[in-house]
Amino acid sequence: FSGIAQVIAAGTVLSDVYLYLGIGLLLTGFAFKVALAPFHMWSPDVYQGAPTTITGFLCTAPKAAGFGAVLKVFMIAFPETFTQWQDLFWVLAALTMTVGNISALVQSNVKRMLAFSSVSHAGYIVIGILVQDMAGISAVLFYLVVYSIMNLGAFAILSMAENDEQDLTFRQFRGLASRNPLLSAAMAIFMVSLAGFPPTAGFIAKYGLFSAAIAKGYIWLVVIAVLNTLVSFYYY
């Protein structure tokens, strides 16, 4: 990757057209992998159709690996082309956050709701990638750890509390607090953290991302992210 960066910096690329075409294809592939809008439509169906334990894995490990690859490729191989792709990342972040949260609002299936929630979190993570410094990298890595723990916990509880794999609706979880107070309390903690309520780890993770972005001048993107976070409070 550093060799690619050296070639680009030296201006010895054979064709800028091929360079930007390659970057575009890479970005499209990564966007599909980590479920960025508008490449996210596979995730709700897959999350709903897969066994709950498998869904917990799908929404964490592949996403963390995908964003790790994005960080390495775009921060090590293509730092010289940052001005060309930063606006596209800005749009992807805003679109992904908004589409994910609005779509999650209207879901009746718990796993589909968490799928669109996962989409919105991908949008938040892109903000950290835009920062392009150590503060952004640290914020992204911490966010991925917190996000993974919260989602693994939430899906573990779903797998223990569910009655029907094919129709895991909110109605099935009515009265969970009286039937199993411990599971109910744990689920509430995970949801509150995913929403970003203080003083949870989710709040600390979002605060780190937003602070790093503000320091780099992405104020309007942070405003959009905060508004989306407020929207997410409703469905969580």
Tell where the protein language model's regions lie, with residue ranges.
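Alpha-helical transmembrane segments of multi-pass membrane proteins predominantly involved
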Residues: 1-236
